[in-house]
């Protein structure tokens, strides 16, 4: 026998060669044995034969004969078994029509197969009638059972089926587009069942779980196993996708044999309940490549069970080869398990793709299969049959052999087995190389973190490049994620902004509404001291270690450090200022370089969900009571009063706000809150000695929650008390130090125990890179050492608090050593991998485990310590996807490295449980960065301004206004710089989170314009300063839209905030005021909200000069002082004489002068071809709004509201009498633009107590705020003495 065959050429079953004959034989052998079970229903072999014979009788009566297709439209049930065997007994072929299939596919299968009779369950009949052609007869088992054969007719005989008769037709998808029906004959499936019986004892001793959807070929040996005498347990609908439901079924029915795809097998293992299936003896894995890693996991999880890897296209009748896995051979070998040797009666041939000649051992070729299990062909598709079922002359002069062309690649192993090498049609030309996608998928699946993987190629619509995208599902056992097994997507992918948004919302604080009616006491020391600010910003999570080498002396100095006090006193002796100073350490610290506020202590996830409540009497001059410390406003808020006892006390009750942490963390919530409490207590222990004080644990009294008015769900964490300092105390912590690869001078790599001021070698085993949280692994590699702290506190409530205290102490060192936490234990059975690893190390050395905290560290530079930005957070922005890609570099050539790795919670599966690559390719996750959005150039001035900053920040050219910031490569660090630059350039005060909430140029522009348009913000801050200098208030020109004042606000450089005043009427639903007097009155009311008292600095541009003048007059009449009134270009630009001489100041579109001025409000010019086109085409407000919207990209409704404001105010003039009675005491300066008409003040007198300063500018009415703004700024700064 040649290597190309290696099989028994004759079928193993002799004599009876049809399925009905085999079943009849089993009925004769054990008629009362259970043939099929479904939930609590059972059928014996005799009952199955009887019911299927009755159905066959009815079908024969309806005209069914050999090779006819009869549809089977039933859900998993006993009806399915009776239906399949009844159709076979009638001599026909059954066509599985799974009700789970899409209706279009079902409709196609029915029509293409020319099926005329379909058996359906009663409840599915109405649905089937909508799918099937009208000439199709629908029958039910109820009808067949009621059928009585007419007298004089004979019942059908089982012998009506022959070995070459069709047994069933399976529709399978392929590269040809439409599904095609594969015709399987009795002799083929009989051979398959005979092989299963002889090779793997699928016989009366076995209980088979039928869980594969019946429309797939692999389901057929499950359904037809009664022919071998086995009992078949029908799984519930959808159980193939429910690992835990499968396990329950296996246990309930004592299933011995299970068939599943590797994806499902991984799911069963990950449940950790798979070992409960004690009855299970055999696991058949097929349908996808079985990775060596999964095989190892399976044999370790289910020792003693047979694991068989099977392979076979539908066209070769289910399984054409198999390979029993030997656990002893799994330590080495290829990444995927061999598909083994051909089944009985089947031959394998691996041929060169070009010559169709056999290849040698180790050479890759295309697999062809021959033998008795080959399908007859494709139903009604002779063309496809001829393409795939070929007559090939394997040797010169030899008789041609009928072979099926699989399209799969393989190679012979030295032992005569076959190694699957991917699909011939799954090779792509990428980056100049021919790449096998299955090879990449298998390589990724052998990564410890990866549960399942698939690789696809997608084109980038903009660049035209091909992107290789790896889609992965993380292993719940191996991937080190926070909230392992219960994690949200934000732990697997750093594209999620969930955690950042939570952090920005101050989730741990009490709501302001809760505190509004309670007495609040402002504490002294709201402005932190330089020492406080420096030490708080020095206390950060360090992810870079740039300070050089670490020595043994450094570690001993770190671990031996103590804080001493020069004196001791009681808390009652604290002055109010000292109490404020102490608590200021626990408040927020803000830096313009950071997206998030900073605290002096660490908090898991930076959520700061632990609250402090002070129970005070005789301290700080406060009345006895329970006070909440509000860290943003540096206040103590009285929650409830306390009856005076005459004894001074200062106790601190710690409360964990569940709602503040639960959106981000699901596991170990209590533990992380207790650790955070420890960090806070540790901070107290560091700062109190300077005041002669210390903090001691006092009691665990959960009843105190009732006095603090907190939510029932919130956690009481413990009570501490401020006491006189009495010297150093035992910290109840046991410390182990591990050194990394020669990075600590004097200490070789290993585990050391710190005791009595010395480090003693404890073990060679250390926490490894893979044992820390995935996103921290690159930091681990940079770290010089790691520290494990074990809590030996006696009281349960103090155990995790002790851990946080110790790390806080170590963080606040003066040795330039920085740390990052990397794992902790759990009270609730969810320890992180570092904890499990250290427990094993301790256990191997006879030391009991306890609550623990692990962190890595290294030396940091002075620059790092002093930095107030977010540089240390940059590493933390890399998630498991990026880290896995880094690891792929070590075992894949560079041209096979994916451009992206996309993490899925679960990869989509097809109905037969395989990874659905088409669904992956169409998924939102894959296409998030590839979506071919149309390029939309910036349209408005605001969009153009934002785009310029955007492109610079992201280092991208030609940004579309619809590009997503984060999908374009942005992150939190870049967001900080982007927002700061936007605020400076545009004179606005966008909050840092605005990029998170409005992540496109378009949305940012809308947000900016919307905020400008809000009535609550009619005084729009165009330039922000943090000092206390009085602001400049400036009114814009006609239309009242202040954005054209941004350049002036940004260029003036007075160290003062600059507000532009938006007219009432710009916002939707507002009606402009009817007089300047009313306008000024309402503006003063809004002004008082910003600046309650004078002196006021008022400026006005163009028409805004009139409003500024009236506002100054009304303020002075109210007794306020105006220190400067600047009237900038108070005259109107001169329009063409013919445009204004007839209509004067009438606001009418018939008045070409008015239309010209209105045009200039939006364009900043009163000439040019656009104006000419406007004057020619515009006839009313609606047409003008449409014209401007098209010209400038402004919203039509906003344009109409601005037009309305202009129309109302265009005619505003002071009468001679009104102006005569208005005399201002404020100094007035008039800046006249070249070419303007006279203003409302000229040719008048008496309006100013002092002669005004008049400055003639070279700039015109519009350029003075644009290209010539430098001239105006120079004159203003000179007048102000700048």
From Swiss-Prot:
What keywords does the record list, in alphabetical order? Lyase, Phosphopantetheine, Phosphoprotein
Molecular-function GO term, any one: lyase activity
Q: Where is the Carrier domain?
A: 937-1012
Cofactors: pantetheine 4'-phosphate
Q: Which residues carry this modification: O-(pantetheine 4'-phosphoryl)serine?
A: 972
Give the catalysed reaction(s), semicolon-separated: 2 FMN + 2 L-glutamine + 2 ATP + O2 = indigoidine + 2 FMNH2 + 2 AMP + 2 diphosphate + 2 H2O; FMN + L-glutamine + ATP = 3-amino-1,5-dihydropyridine-2,6-dione + FMNH2 + AMP + diphosphate; 2 3-amino-1,5-dihydropyridine-2,6-dione + O2 = indigoidine + 2 H2O
Q: Which PANTHER family match?
A: FATTY ACID SYNTHASE (PTHR45527:SF1), NONRIBOSOMAL PEPTIDE SYNTHETASE (PTHR45527)
Q: What is the name of this protein?
A: Indigoidine synthase
């Amino acid at each position: 026998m040649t290597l190309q065959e290696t099989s028994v050429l004759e079928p193993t079953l002799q004599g009876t060669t049809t399925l009905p004959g085999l079943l009849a034989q089993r009925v004769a052998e054990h008629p009362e044995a259970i043939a099929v079970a479904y939930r609590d229903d059972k059928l014996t072999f005799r009952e199955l034969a009887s019911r299927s014979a009755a159905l066959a009788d009815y079908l024969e009566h309806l005209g069914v004969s050999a090779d006819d297709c009869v549809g089977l439209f039933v859900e998993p049930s006993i009806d399915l078994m009776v239906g399949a065997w009844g159709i076979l007994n009638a001599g026909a072929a059954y066509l599985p029509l799974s009700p789970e299939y899409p209706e279009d596919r079902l409709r196609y299968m029915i029509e293409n197969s020319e099926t005329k009779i379909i058996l359906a369950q009663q409840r599915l009949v109405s649905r089937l009638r909508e799918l099937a052609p009208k000439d199709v007869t629908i029958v039910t088992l109820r009808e067949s059972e009621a059928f009585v054969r007419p007298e004089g007719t004979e019942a059908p005989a089982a012998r009506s089926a022959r070995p070459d008769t069709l047994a069933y037709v399976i529709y399978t998808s392929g590269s040809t587009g439409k599904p095609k029906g594969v015709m399987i004959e009795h002799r083929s499936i009989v051979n398959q069942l005979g092989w299963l019986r002889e090779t793997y004892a699928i016989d009366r001793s076995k209980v088979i779980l039928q869980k594969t959807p019946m429309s797939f070929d692999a389901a057929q040996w499950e359904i037809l196993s009664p022919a071998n005498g086995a009992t078949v347990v029908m799984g519930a609908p959808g159980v193939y996708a429910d690992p835990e439901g499968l396990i329950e079924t296996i246990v309930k029915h004592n299933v011995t044999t299970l068939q599943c795809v590797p994806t499902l097998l991984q799911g069963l293992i990950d449940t950790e309940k798979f070992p409960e299936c004690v009855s299970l003896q055999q696991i058949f894995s097929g349908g996808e490549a079985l990775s060596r890693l999964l095989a190892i996991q399976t044999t370790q999880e289910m020792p003693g069970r047979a694991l068989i890897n099977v392979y076979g296209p539908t066209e070769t009748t289910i399984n054409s080869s198999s390979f029993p896995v030997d656990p002893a051979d799994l330590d080495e070998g290829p990444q995927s398990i061999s598909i083994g040797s051909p089944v009985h009666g089947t031959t394998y041939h691996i041929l060169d793709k070009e010559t169709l000649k056999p290849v040698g051992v180790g050479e890759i070729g295309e697999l062809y299969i021959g033998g008795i299990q080959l399908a007859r062909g494709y139903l009604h598709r002779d063309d496809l049959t001829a393409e795939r079922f070929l007559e090939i002359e394997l040797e010169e002069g030899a008789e041609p052999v009928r072979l099926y062309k699989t399209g799969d690649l393989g190679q012979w192993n030295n032992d005569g087995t076959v190694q699957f090498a991917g699909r011939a049609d799954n090779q792509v030309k990428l980056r100049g190389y021919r790449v096998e996608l299955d090879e990449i998928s298998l390589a990724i699946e052998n990564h410890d973190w990866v549960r399942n993987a698939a690789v696809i190629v997608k084109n980038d619509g903009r660049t035209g490049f091909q992107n290789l995208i790896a889609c992965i599902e993380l292993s719940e056992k191996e991937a080190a994620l926070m909230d392992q097994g219960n994690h949200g997507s934000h732990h697997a992918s750093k594209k999620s902004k969930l955690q950042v948004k939570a952090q920005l919302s101050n989730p741990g604080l009490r709501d302001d509404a809760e505190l509004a009616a309670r007495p609040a006491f402002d504490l002294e020391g709201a402005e932190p001291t330089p020492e406080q600010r420096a030490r708080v910003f020095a206390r950060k999570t360090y992810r870079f270690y740039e300070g050089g080498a670490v020595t043994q002396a450094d570690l001993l100095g770190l671990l031996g450090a103590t804080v001493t006090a020069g004196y001791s006193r009681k808390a009652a002796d604290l002055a109010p200022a000292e109490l404020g100073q102490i608590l200021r350490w626990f408040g927020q610290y803000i830096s313009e370089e950071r997206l998030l506020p900073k605290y002096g202590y660490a908090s898991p996830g930076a959520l700061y969900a632990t609250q402090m409540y002070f129970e005070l009497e005789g301290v700080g001059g406060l009345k006895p009571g329970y006070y909440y410390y509000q860290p943003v406003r540096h206040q103590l808020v009285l929650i409830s009063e306390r009856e005076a006892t005459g004894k001074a006390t200062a106790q601190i009750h710690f409360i964990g706000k569940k709602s503040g942490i639960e959106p981000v963390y699901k596991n170990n919530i209590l533990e992380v809150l207790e650790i955070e409490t420890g960090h806070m207590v540790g901070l107290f222990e560091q700062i109190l000695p300077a005041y002669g004080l210390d903090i001691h644990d006092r009691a665990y009294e959960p009843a105190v929650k009732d006095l603090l008015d907190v939510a029932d769900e919130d956690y009481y964490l413990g009570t501490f008390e401020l006491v006189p300092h009495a010297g150093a105390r035992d910290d109840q912590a046991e410390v182990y130090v591990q050194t990394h690869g020669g990075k600590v001078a004097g200490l070789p790599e290993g585990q050391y125990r710190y005791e009595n001021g010395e480090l003693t070698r404890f073990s060679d085993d250390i926490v490894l890179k893979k044992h820390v949280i995935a996103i921290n692994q690159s930091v681990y590699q940079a770290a010089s050492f790691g520290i494990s702290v074990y809590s030996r506190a006696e009281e349960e409530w103090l155990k995790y608090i002790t851990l946080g205290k110790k790390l806080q102490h170590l963080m606040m060192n003066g040795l330039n050593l920085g740390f990052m936490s990397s794992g902790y234990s759990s009270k609730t059975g969810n320890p992180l991998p570092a904890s499990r690893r250290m427990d094993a190390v301790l256990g191997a050395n006879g030391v009991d485990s306890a609550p623990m905290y692990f962190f890595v560290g290294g030396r940091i530079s002075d620059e790092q310590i002093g930095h107030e930005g977010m540089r240390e957070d940059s590493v933390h922005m890399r998630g498991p996807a990026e880290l896995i890609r880094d690891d792929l570099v070590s075992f894949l050539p560079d041209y096979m490295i994916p451009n992206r790795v996309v993490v899925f919670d679960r990869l989509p599966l097809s109905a037969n449980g395989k990874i659905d690559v088409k669904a992956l390719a169409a998924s939102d996750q894959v296409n998030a960065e590839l979506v071919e959005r149309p390029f939309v150039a910036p349209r408005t001035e605001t969009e153009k301004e934002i785009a310029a900053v955007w492109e610079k920040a992201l280092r991208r050219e030609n940004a579309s206004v619809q590009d997503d910031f984060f999908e374009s490569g942005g992150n939190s660090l870049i967001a900080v710089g982007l927002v700061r630059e936007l605020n400076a350039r545009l004179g606005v005060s966008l909050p840092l989170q605005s990029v998170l909430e409005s992540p496109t140029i378009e949305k940012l522009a809308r947000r900016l314009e919307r905020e400008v348009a809000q009535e609550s913000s009619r005084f729009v801050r165009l330039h922000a300063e943090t000092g206390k200098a009085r602001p400049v208030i400036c009114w814009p020109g006609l239309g009242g839209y202040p954005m054209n004042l941004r350049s002036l606000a940004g260029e003036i450089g007075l160290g003062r905030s600059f507000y532009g005043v938006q007219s009432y009427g710009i916002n939707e639903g507002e009606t402009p005021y009817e007089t300047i007097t009313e306008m000024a009155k309402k503006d003063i009311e809004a002004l008082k909200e910003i600046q309650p008292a004078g002196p006021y600095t008022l400026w006005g541009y163009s028409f805004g000069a009139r409003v500024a003048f009236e506002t100054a007059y009304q303020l002075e009449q109210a007794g306020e002082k105006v220190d400067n009134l600047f009237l900038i270009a108070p005259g109107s630009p001169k329009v063409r004489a013919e445009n204004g001489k007839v209509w004067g100041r009438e606001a009418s579109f018939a008045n070409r002068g008015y239309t010209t001025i209105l045009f200039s409000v939006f364009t900043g010019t009163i000439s040019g071809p656009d104006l000419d086109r406007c004057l020619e085409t515009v006839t009313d407000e609606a047409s003008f709004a449409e014209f401007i919207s098209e010209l400038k990209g402004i919203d039509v409704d906003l344009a109409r509201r601005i037009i309305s404001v202009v129309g109302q105010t265009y005619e505003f003039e002071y009468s001679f009498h009104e102006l005569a009675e208005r005399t201002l005491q404020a100094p007035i300066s008039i800046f006249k633009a070249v070419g303007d008409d006279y203003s409302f003040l000229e040719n008048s007198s008496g309006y100013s107590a002092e002669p005004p300063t008049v400055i003639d500018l070279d700039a015109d009415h519009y350029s003075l705020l644009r290209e010539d703004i430098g001239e105006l700024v120079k004159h203003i700064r000179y007048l102000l003495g700048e």
